[in-house]
């Protein structure tokens, strides 16, 4: 039986999954974690993730984090989101109109820019990349600091070679070194309409992309991994491939399918 509401969060300091592939379903959402190879020198995991969803209200709110030095910065971001969960979920319950996404953007920014959170960040060791993705109705909204990636896989977009939604940004972080402490705050936000039919959303930290021999540096290879294959098997195969290529960095994946029945923009 599917639950209408489910909340999940994890950070690598809780369980590191070094040498261990872990894949689990949260209703229709699949979360995959691999902590890297110990024989490549890995001994810790500083990734994190969060999943909220409500089927009745037709939304998902997910986040991946990729911290370095320690997992402290990822832990603080997860705590921040948890503290503001009620307000964020209220916004997500509203209609999928321009104003709703603008209010969500303003809320997320105000959280990261708050005096209290900035003071907390000054006392952590290390910093994190952060990618938040919201799917509401036939739209996705994203907020990104750093180099985590969101892909949108759809056959119509694949025809044009379009897979990646956000641009990876290096030298952006939240934590001890903090983009929101700078004179100008650097981050990326965007909204995109999904296509009619089956859309797959796929978030990942950089371990998958920067693996030795680069089996998945081309997003088309990730797209193809899901063709004629169950999603759990697809993600397991990706983890096995990076494991065999002796990846050191950890990888955290969140992925799910959305079938859009409504008409979408077309000339």
Give the ranges of each region predicted by the language model.
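PP2C/PPM-type serine/threonine phosphatase catalytic domain
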Residues: 1-267
